[in-house]
Amino acid sequence: TPEERFIYFDKTDFGINKIKTVFPTLLEELKNEFMGKVQYVVDIVSEYEKNKGLIGNRFFNGERPEIINIKCGGDWHNDKCVLIIEAENNQKIVFKPTNKKNIEFLQEIIKMFFDEQKYIELYDSLNINEGYWCRFIEHIENKANVKEFYRNYGKILFLAYILGMNDLHYENMIAHGRFPVISDVETIFSTYISADTKRYYYDAHRKAVSLLSNGTISTGLLPVFSMVEYFGGDVSCLSNTGMKVKVQKIKNLGRDDMCIYDEYEIIKTYLHLPYNEVEPLNFVDDILKGFEEATEIWKTKKDEAKYVILKKGKSVESRIILAMSKAYSKICRMRSEVAYREDFKKYEKLIEKLKSFGDYDAIRFSCERIALINGNIPCYYWNESANPVYTYLKKNRINISISSHLKIEDIWKIILNQVSSENIIRQKQYIEDTIQTTKAMVARPEEKSIMLSNRNRTECSPEKIKSEYKKVVDNIIHQVVEGKDGTVEWIGLTVAEQDQLAYQVVDSGIYKGNSGLGILLIQYYILFKDEKVANILGELVHTYSVKERKGLYDTMETSFYNGLTGIYYFLQKYIAVYENKEAVLLKEKI
């Protein structure tokens, strides 16, 4: 039987010998992938034993509990990851192999905005050579004070905004009673540094990236509905719908024909929520209230904040995101697939594809190749005294060719601009709009069916459609980013709740690229002869022309909305309305 054959393979060397024959280098590969990680865990256990007294006094009320279990708490970088130590008497502690100065810096800032000592102590740390120990944050439900939780969330959002933090998705925050606790403090200043390292092709591009990367949207604390399909769900800390992810399962376990297969599942986690059934998107008013409170506190604490940022900010080591970690994770997982274990050159070709996602030189690519082959996610850092951007390989720090010219004094000036009255008003509008947009566009299935049935009952007379057109175009014009060089860009369209119908009546395709927007604006101009729209259309043509001259279309895909086909179709429509030499020449080149 299949079960008996499995027992035979399991109890004899037949299976192992067969694996050695089919995968002759597998054991050596596994050794290279795991030895560094195993040694890291052994070293941290040794550090725990050596510092048990200090750790016990700081975190365990003087007790010195023995280790019972160890869990990995995240991705592996350079053969290191967050470790959760489970000890006697249900006690836990966390070890993080990252810069100990970051959490100390953040704790100093948090003290200015929160009075509760118990909350401030949640960011306590104990430093050692390889990183630091910190408290294990328990998820504590609190149904009675949900509004207060989201008011505190608004204050944390303000702090993340001014400190240029990002990647604060649902896995990097824990709800602890009335308070949200940040569990990943590595991205302090990251958005500022990332924006400074980018290559800008025209002025509207520079302005759009600055508005987006230096805004509340980039923190990860707000939903971005346009990224839901890419990630399989809302990854922000305001999500409670779960993530659609591909998981590996075993079929026919305990039989000789058992195999691994992939299946999509909705994975739900509630650690970032004050309780499981809460609908975070309903608390926008409380989030805004907390954001406003933090803004007022800043006005009274600005001098104190300046001292902390200029003095302690110099020691911050900021993790810089140069590429989507999802791509790295996928390549790491694929290393375990039979096809890539059998043919290493095939895996090398897979890694080569990374070059199409960013600016790669030989050093950066070599570092990422080594990291991925050894089962690690590539990671990059910045520190004021260590420009350019760097990564780690074993004990060595490797500089790559991406640099930032920012100093802490420059970051302070950026922060002052962030808290200007104009920018605070803009950010509050972003907060409200992004949440309302997500409610409209990422509704639950039952809510969507109600929305669609309501839409079907709506009479779309010519006058109604014209009215809805005006609403849509007003929003497009309101959110346009115009450069000094006559270029134009959009950072995304947010939809107020009362304008949901307008977007449904006109065309959902306008979300799918600037060419789609251009076609919509041409149709609008034909109807209303609006000169502002005419100017934006001319700037869009000029922007496409600038991109073509800089070679950005040489390897561009040919899809309709985001590719060359869409641009060509837009230009064809535009030329039918305007006699424009730049558009005609560009159409021929496209």
Predicted features by range, described:
Residues 147, 459, 463-466, 504-511, ...:
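Alpha-solenoid helical-repeat scaffolds
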Residues 132, 152, 449, 507-523, ...:
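Well-ordered alpha-helical segments within folded domains of soluble proteins
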Residues 3, 12-42, 179-468:
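C-terminal catalytic region of ATP-dependent kinase domains
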Residues 436-507, 512, 520-523, 527, ...:
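Low-complexity, Ser/Thr/Pro/Gly-enriched N-terminal "stalk/linker" regions
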Residues 468-487, 532-553, 578-590:
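Long, well-ordered core segments of solenoidal/helical folds
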Residues 170:
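Catalytic-loop Lys-Pro-X-Asn motif of eukaryotic-like protein kinases
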Residues 1-165, 179:
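Conserved ATP-binding subdomain of kinase catalytic cores across diverse folds
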